[in-house]
Amino acid sequence: MTTTIQQRSGANGWQSFCEWVTSTNNRLYVGWFGVLMIPTLLAATTCFIVAFIAAPPVDIDGIREPVAGSLIYGNNIISGAVVPSSNAIGLHFYPIWEAASLDEWLYNGGPYQLVVFHFLIGIFCYMGREWELSYRLGMRPWICVAYSAPVAAASAVFLVYPFGQGSFSDGMPLGISGTFNFMLVFQAEHNILMHPFHMMGVAGVFGGSLFSAMHGSLVTSSLVRETTESESQNYGYKFGQEEETYNIVAAHGYFGRLIFQYASFNNSRSLHFFLAAWPVVGIWFTALGVSTMAFNLNGFNFNQSILDGQGRVLNTWADVLNRANLGMEVMHERNAHNFPLDLAAAESTPVALQAPAIG
């Protein structure tokens, strides 16, 4: 007598699904982080496109003066944006079911929260998916560490800054000119250009661009010739070849003589670590700076710091920058503030010795 034991098809289906999710043979790796990443990024992308094209104006300042951000309300690609949720909503979680109607949800900028929250979850999962694929392939985990820099920057402007300021209306708008407006207002309110962490971020981004260009040009200039004059040098490389495709000794010798010996790396591994670490650390510090300024720990203030022997102010570039900040401050949200507090608190500057006689 023969006994046959048949497993439940449900268990087999779940096992097949698990194997498919974690398989590195798929054209695109899914992974367990991808199971959450795919729907959240699809939701964020879909809502962003629809809102960018057709969303009605949003009462961003909470004063019943809606701001139009979509294309069908007169914007173009440069001026259009998904406008942040209303200051009347503040930091409240505002999904569709919290509004009395869809019109109210749109008027208060609900799509902004939908896009931002799904987008942040999606990029967090993308970072986790990078680690997961590295783990499956037996690679080291530094790819996701590098990606953590832009993730930290996005988290700073979309999540931490609104938390610190007390309203999602202070988050960065999802558009080109809206991003520029966010930057100008950030400078006006927090003096970010005078914050050391922002300076480190500038050094990281510009320095990373410089080092990338230097490295690429040095490698391209010291390729080992494998082709004739009539062929492209790119044909001299075969994918997966064991031998070096460029002469690092020649590149090291050139750069060492161009600058000085110890400015040039003689170890390819330490060189590429440096190329990765420099911009990543810089962007980390920028994100940290935005996150601290979110709670009003602002950039340095050197206004009126130099006086002459009689106590009169000798203006510096810090004072010029301060005047620019005040100008941007009075221009933004001009209908929400009757008078900017930082101007009202300053001493008045006389503009005439006496008033002209009238009549």
Swiss-Prot record:
Binding site for chlorophyll a ChlzD1: 118
Annotated Gene3D superfamilies: Photosystem II protein D1-like
One BP annotation, GO: response to herbicide
Signal peptide: none
Keyword Transmembrane: yes
Catalytic activity: 2 a plastoquinone + 4 hnu + 2 H2O = 2 a plastoquinol + O2
Chain residues that bind pheophytin a: 126
UniProt membrane topology term: Multi-pass membrane protein
Site entry (Cleavage), positions: 344-345
Record-stated family: Belongs to the reaction center PufL/M/PsbA/D family.
Miscellaneous comment: Cyanobacteria usually contain more than 2 copies of the psbA gene.
Function: Photosystem II (PSII) is a light-driven water:plastoquinone oxidoreductase that uses light energy to abstract electrons from H(2)O, generating O(2) and a proton gradient subsequently used for ATP formation. It consists of a core antenna complex that captures photons, and an electron transfer chain that converts photonic excitation into a charge separation. The D1/D2 (PsbA/PsbD) reaction center heterodimer binds P680, the primary electron donor of PSII as well as several subsequent electron acceptors.
Protein name as annotated: Photosystem II protein D1 1
